[in-house]
Structure formats: structure tokens, C-alpha cells
Amino acid sequence: MGTASSLVSPGEVIEDAYGGEGGEACEIPVEVKPKARLLRSSFRRGPRVIGASFKSTGSVELEYAAEYERLRKDYEIFRVSKNNEITSMQKKEAKLDEENKRLRAELQALQKTYQKILREKESALEAKYQAMERAATFEHDRDKVKRQFKIFRETKEKEIQDLLRAKRDLESKLQQLQAQGIQIYDPADSDSDDNHTTVTTAGTQCEYWSGGVLGSEPSMGSMMQLQQTHRGPEFAHSLIDVEGPFANVSRDDWDAAVASLLQVSPHVSQSLWSNTVRCYLIYTHETKAELQTFIQTYSLRLRRFCEGLGHFYLNVSFPEEKAAVFAAERRREMERSSVCVLLLKSSVSSCVVEDVEEAFVKTPDARPLLLYLRTADRKGEKEEVSTLSPATRDLLERVNKADRSAKLKVVDHAGSVEEGAALIFSQLERIIKQELLGLELEENGVVEEREEEDSGDVLWDLHDEQEQIEAFQQACGAAARFSFQKYVDRLNDMVAAPPPTPPLLVSGAPGSGKSLLLAKWIELQQKHSPNTLILYHFTGRPLSTSTDPVLIIKRLTVKLLQHFWSISGLSMDPSKILEEFPRWLERLSARHHGNIIIIIDSIDQIQNAERHMKWLIDPLPANVRVLVSVNVETCPQAWRLWPTLHLDPLNPREVKSVISTECVSVDIKLSKDQEKKLEKHCRSAATCNALYVSLLARLITHFSTSWTLDRTLQQCVMCQDTVSLYRLGLKVALDSLNSDQEKHIMKELLCLVCASHNGISESEVLELFPDLTFPALISMLHNLERLLIITYACGLIRFQHSQACEGVNQEFLDGDKCRGSYREKCIRFFSQQLEQDRVTWRVADELPWLLQQQEDRSKLQMSLLNLFVSQNLYKRGHFSELLAYWQFVGKDKCSMATEYFDALKEFEKTCESEQSMSRLANLYETLGRFLKDLGLLSQAVAPLQRSLEIRETALDPDHPSVAQSLHQLAGVYVHWRKFGNAEQLYKQAMEICENAYGPEHSTVARELDSLSLLYQKQNKYEQAEKLRKRSVKIRQKTARQKGHMYGFALLKRRALQLEELTLGKDSTDCAKTLNELGVLYYLQNNLDAAKLFLTRSLEMRQRVLGPDHPDCAQSLNNLAALHSERKEYESAEELYERALDIRKRALAPDHPSLAYTLKHLAMLYKRRGKLEKAVPLYELALEIREKSFGPKHPSVATALVNLAVLYCQLKQHSDALPLYERALKVYEDSLGRLHPRVGETLKNLAVLSYEEGDFEKAAELYKRAMEIKEAEPSLVCGKAPSRHSSSGDTFSMRSPALPNASR
């Protein structure tokens, strides 16, 4: 570094650049700072003389000094800058230290705060747990106090009833004493009719429960026993007045009609035997071609059609050459057949004549009949007619003569075989649709009707109901073999005990006859107490559908809801179903004018019975009784404290009677030695068991070529219990078969039944075993049924008893070790149906359950993702079962939703036709409802919107199914509390329904109720009440046409069957049936038919019982109601007056039926403007109420209000005022100051004060009335049954509002 001068050696002389003189040499101090010019001079150009001057000799040090200075200067600058940086960094460091200290302090503060919060959280959690414990304790104490209060209340009510009864007894004795001493006794005032039929005084304990169950059946009018609960008759009657359509038909008539029409009685046969359309085909060898063509070409179409509606279809035919061998089977199948088809040409065989004689001649009205007569080709038709054999001509003449009602349908065909088969199919399809299933024949009418039925908010399974009906019928039939007289008497005594009463326990060993006793008792109750509502359930094999507690309670709840205006408020949540059943029971018990009995057979077989039946331990309402039967060995300990009726083994006399009766029925006589042998054998409890003795009798009387009577008897006495006897029965049944193939099939059949969920059907058996002929199957099943091994339930082959299943398990399945292989066989069978797109209720019931039992989770998930399987389960109300399957697979709610969405998207890609798009829309709607029930509201919107879009696009924006989608979507928004969106959708749905069906259709009423509930949630009570009233009016009108009950199609068919029962001689039973038919047709708004039957009933009762019998008053009352409905008030008035006159003379002065007639006659007088004539009737009704219930009962207040209203209409305000004031005091004392009845009475008083000019008082009273209305909106506008209900779109489920006092 430096300048060029640094290169000059020391001692050299450098010429002065300025030309100065030379001088002395001197040393330049290092400190001297050379000038910049000196440094720059070394770079100047030009010739210079370099000398060894003084300046040149000091230039090196000068250059170094300059360089040094420059470096020092740079260093100083660098040093200063670095010092500055260090100072800055120190300041930053100090600042960061301060920040660090601050943050450390904050951290310490936060840690302290965190510790404090943690301690507070722990203390809060501890307080929470303590609060929960206190709440649980409080809830337990509350429930205990509630139960104690309930017991106290009901005990006091019972005491009041007893006091009233004692009072009336004393009055009766006093009258008798007066009659003896003063002779003022008038027989016309007696409580007995001309036939000396006792009518129980109102309010006695016998009015709760009929004691005379075993006596001869009295006529309906002479044994009316209407229960008088603490609410009084006015509540029930006022409900009738509001609810109409049977506003003027007396409640005892309605209850009797419902009891005999809804509850299936054994003596009335069903149109379909065990849910199967059995087509009995009679043919000759000449018409065999038509039969084969029909079976091969058209039979499958009928089967698929019936399967789609939940029924089985079966062709029943016996080959002509083997028909004589199966004579017993032919008779049996003829009785079970739903429709009979005869195919004739020219000649007939003896077997054909026998079948035709049985079906077409002896019982032509028992089933629809179809005659196919094959003539020759058209060219030779005349010649062929003349070639009919004499036997054929005679047979046709007898058939024609027997067809008095012209029900026989004839197909006369002269064309080809294929055309003939097509004609048979066409007529048979029409018969099945119209006469057997009650469907309309309009184009696409059937499908639309089914969809409309499915669109309801309550989903339930017809097959469960059918199964229970058949179980009851079979138990009734089997009970006839035993004498249960002593047990029936004891049951009557236990049931008639004063409330509160815990459930009654019927215990016994398996097979002791518990089910038979309960069925017999139910049958007697239905016969003698038509006003009693009986709900029963018979459980089947363990793990079957009939043992599912959720399905059981749901079915019973639906049966309860039949007696409300709607059945659409039922939650789908399993826990809510179990929780809400006691509430519904209590609500119905408070309004039902009669008794309620719940009977559950084999309750210990129900899955987790003790946990799911907790409601049994709570006190029951006063008019409710519960009977349950249990196996004495498996009865829970907590239930053993209940009142118990134990069934003992049969005594020797009963054993001998059962065996003797069975032997006499088949014409077998036992020798003395054989009788002694049996008597010696049947001495232990196991061998005197009712089922054991019954099976023993069947085995002894069983016909078999390889088993003699002695051999059978010898083998039987070696069996010491029922299961071993069943195993012997299986061996006997096997040995009775002809071939090894049939024996193998029978083993396989029984093993498949054992492995299945609910059993298998006959048509499924024929599919599983193609080599098996129908006659061989029927013969095999007949033998097994006679040996008490199998039975039929809803078209399925099942075991009659659990011991039979255990016998098969031990004999054929090696103690359950081989059951898995048979389940796999069932899985393959139903999976094959699934692959063929045959998704029936059977596939949905069996396949998922079988896969679950086999623990095949992957295949189970695949079956559930078949959208039609899940849809079938969901739409039949098996929501809990569907959830259980998904839980078994290991999926939560969100995963289920995702899986279904993906499956639906895949299915949507394959949809092209209009029909497939309609099915897709149904699937989306089902998924939306399913997700809504799961509580996934946000995810439920998308499928419902997609369903709406598809229906609007594929069908029509104004199609009724679009309204259904709108309704369901609005329901989700209601749950979501998006009321504005919901209101818009409900209104749009209502507009579509009004355009499609008219303004008075049930779907319009549904939308009105939904809107009413919506307005109620928004506190718009006036709008809600207005819509609710409009809905009630619509339902009153449509109820006449739909019968109010969900089983209306069944009622319609029952009406035809009841008509057949009225064709016999005059009798009280026949007259009773005629009256019930009249009531039924009245409810259907078929007033002409109703008048015909009611008139016939009246005339028959007058002939049989006399014109002054109470039953005649009943018929007169109903005829009066009919004339009143037709606006024929003059005739109605005359009939009511005649009925009142009879009941005044025949019944007690305070009998409810008398009060009923008084009330309706008074209402008729008011309607006709005859107010003066109505006054004494209302006064008499008031007097009856006061005598029956005392002056402080709410029903007395209602009578006071009605009389006061009448006085107001007569402008007798001074007479009306004290009645209103007295009624107001009674209402306030008995119902509370905020009850709606108090508000209604205050409103009436306000109107009265206003009319008298006392405006200030009127304003005050009206203000109080409005305060009550606002305080109790749920009582005015209706209230949903549960805030946890899964359906926010449902309307009010409460009883209809009580009528205003101004009524």
C-alpha cells in the first residue's frame, strides 16, 4: 500500500518537483503529517531529475506515516462505530432483560392464575358431582313422594267411592223399609229390567272390573258398566262432543264396536290365513295344460306383487292321481284357502267333485270363487257344449244353484291354452287386489296408496300386529282342552281388588299353560266387558322380533294412540319410546271411559326385561291393571313381591281327561293296563305338566305304520321331561315319512327354522328344496303341527314352544354346534334374493340378523348399505334394530350418514327412468328422516332437499309427493328453530295438498296442525288456535270416511264378515252384531247402510227382549243420532224421547246412560230452539251428577255452566249468575285457579256482566280470563307429547280442548 515514493531506496536523492534549492538533510518526524500534494506529486508525469536531496531521503517515513494515519483514522471510525453498536446492543440487552423480567413476572402471574382456575375447576366439578348426587336424591325423593301421593290420592278416591256407595246402599235400604211399611215402593224405579238383569249402581267397585265373567253373556245394553273416574263423565262426554264423528253415538256403542271390530275374535275368520294368499287350484287332466302355463308364466308375478305388499303367495294344488291319498290335507287346505279356482272342460273325477262340493256348494260365501270353463275351438263350440259329461253338468248346476249371492266369477274360454292362462291370471289378480287386499284398481292407484300410507309420521309394522293376533287365536284354541275355571275366578278377584294395585304375576313352569290361561281370560273379558280396552303381547322364541322391548312398547303405544286424534307424535328414539309409554298410558287412562288392561305373556323372555320394564314398579292409574306371566325359575327377584297366581301341575283327573279327550277325537280306546301305565307314569311335576300331557296324548294317538300303540306308549314312559318327549316326537315324525329324501328334508327344514330369526315360509321352503312337492310338504307340516312341534305365525313356520326348539337343537344340531352352518345356508338364500333385487320384508328381517349372529361385520355393512334393506327396516318402524346393527359394525352416527350418502350417490348414477327417479326420491327422503331421528339436523337437510328437487323435476311441482318432501324438510327446520323457513314450507305443502285433494283432506289437516304447533312455539297462540280448530273440523269429517283407526282396511273387511254372522236366527247376539255394524257404517258416513242395520237391530231386540228393554233404548239412541246427522231433527227428537222414557223406567236414576240420553236430547232441543223443554233436562242431568259425585266435583260444575248458558239464552240472567258463580268456585277448588275451565267460566261471567251493564266488572273478569289463557297456552293451543319427540312436524297430541261453557 502507499504511493510510488515508497519504492525509492534510502539515500537516493529525489528532485524537488517545485525546482527549489537543495537544503540540509533532516529527519522528518513521524508525527508530521505530510501534505496531500506531496503524495500526489509522485504520480505526475514528465521528465524529472532525481537527486539525493533532504526531502527525498525522508519520504518513506512520510509515506508510512500517512498510511498509518489513514489506517488510524479508519480504525477510529471503526472503533467509534463499534462502540456505538456495543452501546446500542447494551441498551437493547438491558431492554431485553427488562422485557424478560416482565414476561417472567407475567408468566408467574399466569401460572398462579392457572393454579387458581384449576383449583376452582376442581371445586366446581366437586360441587357439580355433589349437586348431581343431591339432584338424584331429590329426584328419588320426589318420585317416592309422587308415588306416595298417588297412592294417597287414589286411596282417598276409593274411600270417597265407598262412602258414596254406602250412602246409596243406605238410601236403597231406606226405600225398601219405606216400601215395606208405607207401601210406596214403585217397581218402575227398580234398577232391574224386565229380565231381572242387575245394573250396577254408578260408582261401585264393580264398575271398575266386571266380576261375572263366567256367567251367561247378557245383552250389551243391560250390562253397561261405564267407569266413573275422579274426572267424571262430563269430561269423557265433552271429548266426544268435540271430537265427533260419533258425537251423537253413545260411547258404550262405540266401545263395543271397537272391541269387537279392532280386537280380532277367534270366531271371525280372516280373509288371509296367516298373511298368505293361498290360491287353491282344482283341475282335471284336461285342463292341466292351462294350470302349468299359469304357474310357469304368471304365478311368479302374483308372488312378487304380494311380496311387495308384505304378504306371501302360494299355489295350492294336488295331482289328480294322488289326490285321494291326501284327503285330510285337501280338506285342511280348503279351509285355509283365500281364493278357489276351478278349471273344467268336459269330465270330472271323484276327487274334483269332492273339492268342488266343499268349496263351491257347501261354503260358497267363505272365499272368492273363480270358474274357468274350457270349451272347444270356436268352430266346434256348439258341439263341445253338448259333450259335457252328465257328472260335469250336474256339478255345474249345483254350483250355479249354490251361488245365491252371484259372487262366482266365470271365465268361458274357447281359445288357446296361453290365452286361457292369461284370463285366469287377469281375474285372479283382480280378486286378490280388490277382494282380498282391499286395494283400488285404478291405474297406479295401488302404488300411490301405499306411498301415501308410508308418508305418515308414525312408522309401525303390520306384521307385528298380525303375529300377535295369530298368537292370541292359537292360544284361545289350545285353551279349550283345559279347564282354567279356578284360575279365571282367582284372576277376576285379583283384578277387581281396589287400587292402587301392582302388576299381577302369573307364574308357572315352562309349558304349564300360562299363555293359554291369559288368552282364555282375554277372550272372556272381550266377550263380557266390551268397554274394556285390552292390550296384550305374547312373546315368542328368545332373540326373535317379538322379544324386542322397544318394538313391544312401541306397538302398545300405537294401540294407545289409536284413541287420540293422531298417532303421529311418537318418537323414534328407543329410549324415548320406553320413557314416554307410561305418560301416554296415564293420559289415556284419564280420558278413557272404561278400564285398561295390559297383558304381557312370558315377560321374562323379553331382552333385558327388568331394565326396560321399569314402569311396572310405579303405581298404576286407578283404572289400569297389568297382568304378566313369568317362568317361575327365571322370574326376577324384585317381581316376586307382586300378587302372584301360580299354576300348579295337572292333577290325575285332569291328566286322564286330556288324554281321554284326545283318544275320543281319533276313535282310539286305551286298555285298562295302558291306562294304569299312564296313570303310574304321570305322577311327578314334570310329567303332569300341561304341555307334557298334551304332547303325550298326541303321540299316543298319532297314526304311524312303524309305531304301534304299545311301542309308542313304552317309549313315552321312558321320557321324564318335555324336551325328551319332543325328541321322541321327532323320531316318530321321521319314521312316518316314506323316503329318505323326505326325512332329510324334514331334518333340514327344522334346523333352518331353528337357525332363522323369525322362522321361514312355505314358499321359501319350496324354493330351498326344489325336489319337494307341495303335497309332500303339506303332509309333513301337518304331522309336525299335530305333534305340537311347529305352528304358523304371520305366514312363517315356527316352533310352538321353546321346548320343541330345544328338542330339535339336541336331536339334530348336536347341542347348537351345527347351527352356524344352517345360518350360512339361510344367508346364501336371502343374499341370492338380494342380488335379484327382491328386497322384501323377509330379506330385511332375516339377512342382517343372521350376519350379526355370524359376526360377519363386513357383509352386514354391505347388506345395510343396500338402501332398500335399510329403507324397509326404517319404514316398518325397526329403527332401534337398524341402529343396533350399525353399532355392531362399529359405526357412529356421522359415519352412518357418510356411508348412506356415498351409497345413494352411486345408486343415483344408475337411475334413468321415471320410476327409478321416484324410488331415488323416496330413498333420499327416508335418509333425511333417518338422520333427523338420529339428531343430525344439518346433515338431514341435504337429502330432503335432493328428494324435493327430484320430485319436482321427475313428477310435477304440484304433485302430492312434493308436499310430502316439503313437510319433512319443514320438520327439520322446526327442530333447528328456523321457524321462518319452516312456515314457508308448511304453507307451500298445504297449498299443494289443497289443490290435489281439496281443502278438507287429512293431509291438509296434517299441515294445519304442523303450522299450529309452529305458531305455538313462536307464542302466536291466536293463530295456532285458529288453525287447530280448522284441523279438528277436517278430521271430524274425514274420520267418518276413514274410521278414525289405523286399521280401517281391516274394519272394512270385518264389516262384510259380520254381515255373514247376522244371517242366522233372531238372538241377542245377532241384534248386538247388527247394532255394531250400524255404528261402523255410521262412522264410515254410509248413513243408508247404518240406518238399515240399526233398524234391523231395533226390530230384532223388540221381538226378542221386548219393547221396554234397555237394549232397545240403545238402538233408539243410535237411530236418533243418525237422524240428527241427516238434519232430520223431528224424527231424532221422537227417538231420543222414546229412548229416554225406556231408560228412565229401566235404569237407576243416576245411571250414566240415562244422563247421556238426557244430554243429547237437551242439545237437540237447543238446536231446534226449544229452550224451555231443554231446561228440565239439564236440571235433571245436574241432579244426577250431584248424586253420583257430590256437589264439588268438576262434572257438576260443567252441568252448572251448561244450565247457566241456557238461562242466558232465555235472558234469565238473574238465574244464570248464581250458577256461574257456583261453577267457578267448584272449578277453582277442584282444578286450580289457573285451569282453562276457570278461564272459560270467567269469560262467560264477563259476558253476562257486560249484558247487565256492569262494564267495570266485565273488564276485570275478562282480564283475569286472558291472564289464565296466557299462563296456560299449552292447554289452550295443544301440546306435543314430549319435547324430545323425534318429529317436530307433528301436531298436537293432547286431548282435544274441552268445550267452552257457551256450548
From Swiss-Prot:
Q: Which GO terms describe its cellular component?
A: ciliary base; ciliary inversin compartment; cilium
Native source organism of the sequence: Danio rerio
Q: Which residues form a coiled coil?
A: 81-183
Q: Where is this region: Disordered?
A: 1276-1303
Q: Which SMART domains match?
A: TPR (SM00028)
Entry superkingdom? Eukaryota
- Pfam families, sorted: NPHP3, NPHP3_hel, NPHP3_N, TPR_12, TPR_7, TPR_NPHP3
Its function, per the record, reads:
Required for normal ciliary development and function. Inhibits disheveled-1-induced canonical Wnt-signaling activity and may also play a role in the control of non-canonical Wnt signaling that regulates planar cell polarity. Probably acts as a molecular switch between different Wnt signaling pathways. Required for proper convergent extension cell movements.
Residue spans of biased composition, Polar residues class: 1283-1293
Residue spans of the TPR repeats: 449-482, 802-840, 921-954, 963-996, 1005-1038, 1071-1104, 1113-1146, 1155-1188, 1197-1230, 1239-1272
Q: What is its main location?
A: other
Task: Tell me where the signal peptide lies.
Answer: none
What is the reported phenotype of gene knockout? Morpholino knockdown of the protein in the embryo causes ventral body curvature, pronephric cyst formation and laterality defects, including reversed heart looping.
What name does UniProt use for this protein?
Answer: Nephrocystin-3
Cellular location of this protein?
Cell projection, Cilium
Question: Could you confirm whether the keyword Repeat appears in this record?
Answer: yes
Task: Tell me the keywords, alphabetical order.
Answer: Cell projection, Cilium, Coiled coil, Repeat, TPR repeat, Wnt signaling pathway
